[in-house]
Amino acid sequence: MVPEVRVLSSLLGLALLWFPLDSHARARPDMFCLFHGKRYSPGESWHPYLEPQGLMYCLRCTCSEGAHVSCYRLHCPPVHCPQPVTEPQQCCPKCVEPHTPSGLRAPPKSCQHNGTMYQHGEIFSAHELFPSRLPNQCVLCSCTEGQIYCGLTTCPEPGCPAPLPLPDSCCQACKDEASEQSDEEDSVQSLHGVRHPQDPCSSDAGRKRGPGTPAPTGLSAPLSFIPRHFRPKGAGSTTVKIVLKEKHKKACVHGGKTYSHGEVWHPAFRAFGPLPCILCTCEDGRQDCQRVTCPTEYPCRHPEKVAGKCCKICPEDKADPGHSEISSTRCPKAPGRVLVHTSVSPSPDNLRRFALEHEASDLVEIYLWKLVKGIFHLTQIKKVRKQDFQKEAQHFRLLAGPHEGHWNVFLAQTLELKVTASPDKVTKT
């Protein structure tokens, strides 16, 4: 299969060379990418269609901010089963759950955004959702069970004049870093699959992994262990929202900035600066500002007060700003696999519950999301013992058993999650 993919990648490269003028934008302000006669907006991505093969599901093209088309081959996570299967319109093979009778489980729902279909678990960019983002911010979205979750991410400075896009990311990196995307399963992976051979937290330097050992990844590592070049900067406020299927809504203007419908921000005044305990929401052109209500319970015993934040945070969620290297004495555990469950018990339409069952842990994390004014907010993270979770397992349905890093792609990049303590108040922790 690998030679076939390389041949298809070569065909795509020839196609891009054959249509060099199609890959560049015309003149501002109407900037777009033209690929095989179809227009794409900056930030939009798609599977290319090449004759005679048709849609290339293992290849993805992206229209950059400079309106240049770049295409790359999708990297599939390792599978740990003797007979993985590849379903139609999917690139990566997956394991078939042996305990589920055939035909009883519906296939994961796909997502559609701006005329492009995305498969369950696929990651893409959608910059138009946050028109007021900073130059070093980008929007990363993920398709999960037919719903699109998007996050505003603050990218590190690449430090070179011509950075390249990273697969499974909306950020860019220098050529040396981006070209180090490894095709070998034995490579040491870190955030977004970029290799860092000097990572002291890699699994037993120099030793080969066994056939059943998961590939190491830094996606689910605590923020303080993320390599300096890829650690999100705290200057940018990060929001996590779900894009609902609704008609276009009016934007809001506050302090000279434009905010799209559903976007939230902390207002700022010259005499006081940003107000972390006040949160404003754009609702179809109208600004609604509320005072933050902090959670009464935290997932740790001793939450701490941090300057610049309204509510206390757990110590393990803090990033050391002076920590420029990966710790050589404290290394995160290998994430392994994680089973993702969704609640099937009757519940209001404005609630979503997910349960994450880690292989290497005796605890199960239950995430509760609540729909508040058109946006799903993370309201609670509760940890229960596996034996206690098994007692209510009949109320959950297994979605998939992906590598933990895939599920945590947003958590690894997100410095702040919106947490609600009441249906009408929103809190940033």
From Swiss-Prot:
Keywords: Chondrogenesis, Cytoplasm, Developmental protein, Differentiation, Glycoprotein, Osteogenesis, Phosphoprotein, Repeat, Secreted, Signal. SMART domains: VWC. Residues 182-224 are annotated as: Disordered. InterPro entries: CHRDL1/2, CHRDL_1/2_C, VWF_dom. The keyword Glycosyltransferase does not apply. Glycans are attached at residue 114. Phosphorylated by FAM20C in the extracellular medium. The modification Phosphoserine is found at residue 182. Disulfide bonds: none annotated. Pfam families: CHRDL_1_2_C, VWC. The keyword Phosphoprotein applies. It comes from the Eukaryota. Residues 31-96, 109-175, 250-315 form the VWFC domain. GO terms for cellular component: cytoplasm; extracellular space. Highly expressed in uterus. Moderately expressed in heart, liver, prostate, testis and ovary. Weakly expressed in skeletal muscle, kidney, spleen, small intestine and colon. Expressed in the secretory epithelial cells of uterine endometrium, fallopian tubes, endocervical glands, bladder and prostate, as well as the transitional epithelium of the urinary bladder, and in bone osteoblasts (at protein level). In normal cartilage, expression was confined in a few chondrocytes in the superficial zone as well as in the middle zone. Induction: Up-regulated in breast tumors but also in lung and colon tumors. GO terms for biological process: cartilage development; cell differentiation; negative regulation of BMP signaling pathway; ossification. GO terms for molecular function: BMP binding. Residues 1-25 form the signal peptide. PANTHER family: CHORDIN-LIKE PROTEIN 2, VWFC DOMAIN-CONTAINING PROTEIN. May inhibit BMPs activity by blocking their interaction with their receptors. Has a negative regulator effect on the cartilage formation/regeneration from immature mesenchymal cells, by preventing or reducing the rate of matrix accumulation. Implicated in tumor angiogenesis. May play a role during myoblast and osteoblast differentiation, and maturation. Interacts with GDF5. May interact with BMP2, BMP4, BMP5, BMP6, BMP7 and INHBA. This is Chordin-like protein 2. It comes from Homo sapiens (Human). The lineage of its organism: Eukaryota, Metazoa, Chordata, Craniata, Vertebrata.
